[in-house]
Amino acid sequence: MSVSTAAADQSVCTPLPVLGRDVTVPLVTGGEVSYAALDYAASAPALQRVWDDVAAYAPYYGSVHRGAGYLSQLSTDLFENARKTVADFLGCRPADQVIFTRSTTDSLNLLARVIPADCQVFVFETEHHASLLPWQDARVTYLDAPRTPRQAVETLERALADRDPYGPALVCVTGASNVTGELWPVRELAVAAHAHGARIVLDAAQLAPHHPVDLRDLDVDWVAFSGHKLYAPFGSGVLAGRADWLQAAEPYLAGGGASRKVTRREDGGVAVEWHETAARHEAGSPNVIGAYAIASACKALTEAGWDSLVTREQHLIAKVREGLAEVPEVRVLSLFGDDAPRVGVISFVVEGWNSSHFAAALSAEYGIGVRDGLFCAHPLVRTLLGSDAQTQGECGAPEAAPGEKSLNAIRVSFGAGTPDEHVERFVNAVGELVAEGAKWQYRTEDGRCVPAV
């Protein structure tokens, strides 16, 4: 479908209303413009519906599982119903547990704490650091970056078959890259993992906001995601999946809520009986607003219809990719090639530009918010840029003059709340900056490239 056809196609739905859609920001060149939020991959704006639901509940806030009063009972019901909503959203199996955490990072660190002592972990070097780093106490095999989905499956199959000893194993894989937006062959990787007696956890931080995620259909053992990327930025995340490892392990955090019974022992110490439900790993007063916000977002996306949401996002992806393709100095980063299916996450570099300088100009001169740096995926960005594994990369602005080559990139990302005008302004701004240069001078301050005023 061409951009012109898509624009006229009534099947392309309108953006979902998001908080902040009417915010204006000042331009360094004078005047104001509506803010084009194109950094959804870092944090997506709250859906208006999510905000409205949270605001409606807030006066009734009460403690969860800790009170006999009406507001406490209401809040407890809200919290547990949110758990059920998330389970339905993820297609959880009847015996699966849904645990509310702080984020994807927190979820994967929780899982890392509960894996069996002799478990081997297999993870591709292309993962976000939230998936790459939590396994420090386990035997970890880091797999080289594949250049095709088929190569990813074959690489995993070889590694699992060759493991010694042939014991418990866990594979951690992303559903969609936070750098390239490319979809990974999750179902095929799950088949490979299970064929070799391993389990698999899906990092769905970048997948769940863009595509339906179904544990049973994908046949993954666990899934992790963050509310703040799912249009519910209120401090909660989710780990959902098989209960056995979770029930067998010591609680992630020790404290009230996780304990079912605490008694004094004859030797003067204390004996603890931990819950076997999700509460085992939810010690402390839970973030009921965060959980409720995630549930609200799950309902909103489901009711909007995934077919419509995906169609609209593909329309926006086509606009951006076609626009960038018209600028010869732009190189879009990709593992699997131009034809690989992807979500609305695109990273690129511009010949003759420092990526931090380019991102700063987009913000200061056009009111466009993107991200620059290594995107918490340092090994992947080094691979995509063809640099040595030990080369120092840059997160934020380097101590370098504008135009000096840098080991970082620019990322534009969008989703259900993005209007056409935002991506059109972005494409036009890229072309104009490359053709005419920045209108302002920039300098480095506290690790960021900022206008020199």
Q: Which residue stretches match the model-derived regions?
A:
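Pyridoxal 5′-phosphate
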Residues: 1-453
